[in-house]
Amino acid sequence: EQAKKLQNLRLDPSEAIDRITRAGLEVMGGFIVGFDSDGPEIFALQRAFLERQPVPLAMVGMLTALPGTALWRRLEAEGRLRQHSNGDQFSRPNFKPMMDERALLRGYAELMEWIYSPKAYYSRCEAHLHRAGLISETRSSTLGEVGALLRTIWHVGVLSPRRRLFWRLMVKAMLRGRNRMRQAVTHAVQGEHLIKYTREHVVPRMERALEEIHAGIEHDPRQFQPDGGKPPSGKPPARLRLSSGVER
């Protein structure tokens, strides 16, 4: 309701996702956290919802106030807009949130880390494979697709530490037909990228944002070195490090 997307309230989200998936289509989920009505429990609610859904690709973003929007004007009137923002989704928001900012950043980072943990990601891929409606096969695989499959088998099925999850998905996909096999391979490749990107880029950037708060620095990216280094106060205490406990 706060986003004025009332069309999303006409049907239960889980029912809508199930209908679309059983029709043979794939749902890609987009979620936003950081609304004024959101409390720290929002992250557990988002996780509980996604655990029940056949949605491999899910992106959660923190609310951002865009110039010229009703949200921007309201926050400006309330004196909550920040003067400096680099537009980085994986940093501090460009306004002062109602939720404790540490709780917002930590909860967001841990939710993203869980979404793209290997076990959770492949579990959603298998859920989609199980529920997806069958699509008639109308063409044979091209040489390019065969080559892509062989490269995927080598990089994900042999070299990757996630190879067991990959082969489990592949075996289940083989039983569902050629088109499902294509889709499973695509999911595996996408997952390999997203799992690494979340671990190597998203989480470290969120940790730096938490360090910024600990250092008592008002949000201004110009106060940081271009190499993405630490705030001037030095290394933060260990309690600021994220520890969601998910399998990486």
Residue map of PLM features:
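Terminal low-complexity segments of carbohydrate-biosynthetic enzymes
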Residues: 124, 136-248
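A structural motif corresponding to the C-terminal lobe/cap of the Radical SAM core domain
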Residues: 1-149, 156-157, 232-247
